[in-house]
Amino acid sequence: MPSGSSAALALALAAAPAPLPQPPPLPPPPPAGGPELEGDGLLLRERLAALGLDDPSPAEPGAPALRAAAVAAAAAAQCQARRATGLAPEEPGRLATSETAELELEVDEEEGEEAELDGELLEEEELEEAEEEDRPSLLLLSPPAATASQTQPIPGGPLGSVLLPAAGFDAREAAAAGVLYGGDDAQGMMAAMLSHAYGPGGGGAAAAALNGEQAALLRRKSVNTTECVPVPSSEHVAEIVGRQGCKIKALRAKTNTYIKTPVRGEEPIFVVTGRKEDVAMAKREILSAAEHFSMIRASRNKNGPALGGLSCSPNLPGQTTVQVRVPYRVVGLVVGPKGATIKRIQQQTHTYIVTPSRDKEPVFEVTGMPENVDRAREEIEMHIAMRTGNYIELNEENDFHYNGTDVSFEGGTLGSAWLSSNPVPPSRARMMSNYRNDSSSSLGSGSTDSYFGSNRLADFSPTSPFSTGNFWFGDTLPSVGSEDLTVDSPAFDSLPTSAQTIWTPFEPVNPLSGFGSDPSGNMKTQRRGSQPSTPRLSPTFPESIEHPLARRVRSDPPSTGNHVGLPIYIPAFSNGTNSYSSSNGGSTSSSPPESRRKHDCVICFENEVIAALVPCGHNLFCMECANKICEKRTPSCPVCQTAVTQAIQIHS
């Protein structure tokens, strides 16, 4: 048997094609049955035991050799297949040569047995590979063995794992090995990531990533910038900030920036903080708003009047602008808390009102339709009068000025003058309401508003339509001589108890006399040293002070001619400005009620005002009195002396 084996081996080697490149051949194996063959059989038996294969008949002669030949054939086939794909290294030369020789020797003799053994070996190898599929990551993540053990076969693993050294794996090879040995993609990726993390240089990569995040945060913080945006004036600041900061809050939200507004008294500079592009957008918005406001102011100043109180050219067709000048101390009063008062006036009158700034003249600019502008001006003046309690002081500076109008005897006109005899400090002064006319008529719906005393007698304002004489309530006015104009008549200390005797007759009383043409005779000054003990509702001049009216009458006579025979009538109501005043005397003076009473007829004082005269439109009468006026031979309005055609009833 040994000689036949040698001959068969020689013939197979001669007829075989050129083999793949092999390492240098080792000496030929000894004959079968020698000590080397026994050693090879032991080695194969150990490998079979490690692979879980039991020797079915160890005592049978020749069985170890057959089993060894079968294992060698399977190993050679797998090695050749893996060499073709480039995955397996070359086998050791000695093992490859001996096993190939044994394979070739037994091919011709025992083909059937070899095929059966090959089938059994392949089935068992597939079972073991299926078992190893559950733990591919254990193979990949196992720590590298010692250098001496790297070349030794690893028992218990598949055949490919025996031939592949564990220390030569990198991340890509680990992932490929995981897929090769049955592991799915998720496990292979996990193995690759873990091997990369625990591999050489993994700690340095993590530190580099951390440093990169910190650098990004620092760069993000460093992109914030701060820029100052100046505007022309504090008025521009107020326009940009808006009421209660509404505009600047919207700008902050729109641009995603923080905008610090300048404080009153500081430089008008906005400080904007945020990202560079956001700051640039906020700066453009602020400068655009400031430029827009500057253009509005420029056009307003161009069209504005040179003198206060005159209307300028309208901004829109049909609109006009009027400047209303007020005292410095009441600017805030007109504006109101947070602009509530001026806003209410704008809404009620349908106008646009520009409030004056602190460093400008106290002038309100009212823009709108002419009738609305007049109403707004009246509302402003009425609010000032009601809140401040406008009153007249008898001093040298106040020469009978009332509401900006100099009421005097200039120009040959005798204006009616009513004042209280004993003015008190402003805290105790009664309010002199400054009710203006409504645009619907000369007196308007509020023309009869007044404060009445205990005898229901109103004290009226200086202006009066009857400009031809001086009008007093009560009995006949004593003659006024050119030497003495100051009077001290006790007839005015008490009021008549019947109001009808005052209003209904309208009879002329003694005319004023003594107004001579010689101005030199009117220069005498006479003063009284006694203070009246009781306040008076009459127009009696105070005894301690010479009234400016008397002083003006002496210095400026009405005209060169004599005014003799001027009839004196009791005025029903004043025309123009309905400004009524009540007595502001001491404790014995009549005080106004807490609330205004209903509008009573100015003739009978009994019925409510429900009628108006046509065409003048004075709605001051009850229907009965209005009809009586129309039934007269020459019907005329008691207020303006205009001819009356009819009386109409007012439904409110």
Curated annotation (Swiss-Prot):
Keyword Acetylation belongs to the record: no
Phosphoserine: residues bearing it: 530, 538
InterPro entries linked: KH-I_MEX3_rpt1, KH-I_MEX3_rpt2, KH_dom, KH_dom_type_1, KH_dom_type_1_sf, MEX3, Znf_RING, Znf_RING/FYVE/PHD
Biased composition regions of type Pro residues, renumbered to the chain: 18-33
EC class name: transferase
Places the protein is found: Nucleus; Cytoplasm
Chemical reaction(s) catalysed: S-ubiquitinyl-[E2 ubiquitin-conjugating enzyme]-L-cysteine + [acceptor protein]-L-lysine = [E2 ubiquitin-conjugating enzyme]-L-cysteine + N(6)-ubiquitinyl-[acceptor protein]-L-lysine
Pfam families membership: KH_1 (PF00013), zf-C3HC4_3 (PF13920)
GO cellular component terms, semicolon-separated: cytoplasm; nucleus
Protein's UniProt name: RNA-binding E3 ubiquitin-protein ligase MEX3C
Organism annotation: Mus musculus
Upper taxonomic lineage: Eukaryota, Metazoa, Chordata, Craniata, Vertebrata
